[in-house]
Amino acid sequence: MKVGVFDSGLGGLTVLKSILKVLKNAEIFYIADTAYAPYGEKDSALILKRCEDITNYLLKEYKIDALIVACNTATSAAIKHLRDNFSSLIVIGTEPGIKPAILNTKSSNIGILATPSTLKSDKYQLLVNELSSIKKVNLFEQACPGLAMQIEKGEINTLTTYKMLEEWLIPMKEANVDTIVLGCTHYPLISQTIKKIMGEDITLIQTGDAIAKRLLSLSEEKGHKNIGDLKVTVLHTGLINLDMIENILENKNIEVRKCEI
């Protein structure tokens, strides 16, 4: 089985890491579209065009069977278009884990950390409206401009990143938020910093494991056998932080090279 995974940068590697836990027999091609990062601060038309171009590239060069849109912003902008226009593919998107957050919270106060584009998207608003009937909760939504790029540069444990998070999180802490949705695939990489500010009891919801399970289920339905060896290739369209790749994937045996899309 050949699987394409993409994000504007390295955040989607948190999803890839989850996939590597469950998928045993696959060729995986990860594209970090760093020449256009971050998607979360780009307009939806450009994001849609990049998603289409990347999908066409993965189909032409690697004949993928499945596509994982490992980015909340790209999912909001393009997932319907990709499913409609690439019907031969298994297409799985990434959306904020609001439902598990609603089911988990004890205080009924939930924080949402996401990019500006995700929070403004129709898809996000539709998701919130659909889930509002499960249980009455208070959502504390926080757009985080610049945070994905801080993480992309490897500034995970820096004072600057801490101060950014502190400004956004202290109001949530004061409001007795007990569950936070990490609405960007970059954000699991700063989980420890979030816990330093919010306390160790805070529940953080990220969607990588759910995506991996969904991929495994759909691949088995298609008849793909989950035995054999894994091969992972990381492709990037612009500059990339090699140390971050090694740290996130924990020195998995991977090939890294630049591509033109």
From Swiss-Prot:
Stretches that traverse the bilayer: none
GO molecular function: glutamate racemase activity
Annotated GO biological process: cell wall organization; peptidoglycan biosynthetic process; regulation of cell shape
Keywords, sorted A to Z: Cell shape, Cell wall biogenesis/degradation, Isomerase, Peptidoglycan synthesis
EC number(s) from the headed UniProt entry: 5.1.1.3
Coiled-coil residue windows: none
Metabolic or biological pathway, per its Swiss-Prot or TrEMBL entry: Cell wall biogenesis; peptidoglycan biosynthesis
Catalytic activity entry: L-glutamate = D-glutamate
Residues of the active site: C71, C184
Gene3D superfamilies for this protein: 3.40.50.1860
One matching Pfam family: Asp_Glu_race
Binding residues annotated for substrate, in chain numbering: D7, S8, Y39, G40, N72, T73, T185, H186
Family statement drawn from the similarity comment of this UniProt entry: Belongs to the aspartate/glutamate racemases family.
HAMAP family on file: Glu_racemase (MF_00258)
Protein's job: Provides the (R)-glutamate required for cell wall biosynthesis.
The protein's name: Glutamate racemase
